[in-house]
C-alpha cells in the first residue's frame, strides 16, 4: 500500500515539474522577451534578399541575421522562424500577419528557403 502511495506521489511530482517546464518554455519564446523585434526584422531582410533578389549586401544581411539569432536561445529558433513565416506580434502585443505577407510574389520561395534553413540544423 505504501508503495502505491509513493508511486502516485512520485508521478504527481513529475507531472508538476513537466507542467512547470512546459509553461516556462512557452513564456520564454515570446516576442519581446528572448525573441527581439530587431532579430525578427534581421531574419526577414535576409530571407527576402536570398529569395526575392532584392539588392542588399548578402554578407552583411547574413551576418546581421546570424548575430541576432545567436542572441536567442536555441530552443526558440523554430518559434522565431514560425513567427517570421506565419505571424508576428508587435511591441504593443498586437498579432499581425506574417512579416512576409507583403512579399506575396516571393512568399512561396521564401517559405522553401526558411524550411531549408531549419532542415540543415
From Swiss-Prot:
User: In the record, which residues are listed under signal peptide?
Assistant: 1-24
Q: Which CDD domains does UniProt cross-reference here?
A: AAI_SS
Q: Which InterPro entries match?
A: Bifun_inhib/LTP/seed_sf, Bifunc_inhib/LTP/seed_store
**Which residues form each disulfide bond in the chain?**
none
Coiled-coil stretches noted in the UniProt entry, renumbered to this chain: none
Compartment list: Secreted
Q: Does the keyword Signal apply?
A: yes
Pfam families per the record?
A: Tryp_alpha_amyl
Q: Does the keyword Plastid apply?
A: no
Output a single Gene Ontology CC term carried by this record. Answer: extracellular region
Any one GO molecular-function label of the UniProt entry = serine-type endopeptidase inhibitor activity
User: Which Gene3D superfamilies has this protein been placed in?
Assistant: Plant lipid-transfer and hydrophobic proteins (1.10.110.10)
Of which family is this protein a member? Belongs to the protease inhibitor I6 (cereal trypsin/alpha-amylase inhibitor) family.
Name this polypeptide is given: Trypsin/alpha-amylase inhibitor CMX2
> Source species, please?
Triticum aestivum
From which lineage does this chain's organism come? Eukaryota, Viridiplantae, Streptophyta, Embryophyta, Tracheophyta
Amino acid at each position: 500500500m505504501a508503495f502505491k502511495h509513493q508511486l502516485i506521489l512520485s508521478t504527481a511530482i513529475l507531472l508538476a515539474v513537466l507542467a512547470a517546464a512546459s509553461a516556462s518554455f512557452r513564456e520564454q519564446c515570446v516576442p519581446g522577451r528572448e525573441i527581439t523585434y530587431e532579430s525578427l526584422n534581421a531574419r526577414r531582410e535576409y530571407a527576402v534578399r536570398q529569395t526575392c533578389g532584392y539588392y542588399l549586401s548578402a554578407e552583411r544581411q547574413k551576418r546581421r541575421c546570424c548575430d541576432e539569432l545567436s542572441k536567442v536561445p536555441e530552443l526558440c529558433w523554430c518559434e522565431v522562424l514560425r513567427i517570421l513565416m506565419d505571424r508576428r506580434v508587435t511591441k504593443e502585443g498586437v498579432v499581425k500577419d506574417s512579416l512576409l505577407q507583403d512579399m506575396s510574389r516571393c512568399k512561396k520561395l521564401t517559405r522553401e528557403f526558411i524550411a531549408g534553413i531549419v532542415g540543415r540544423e
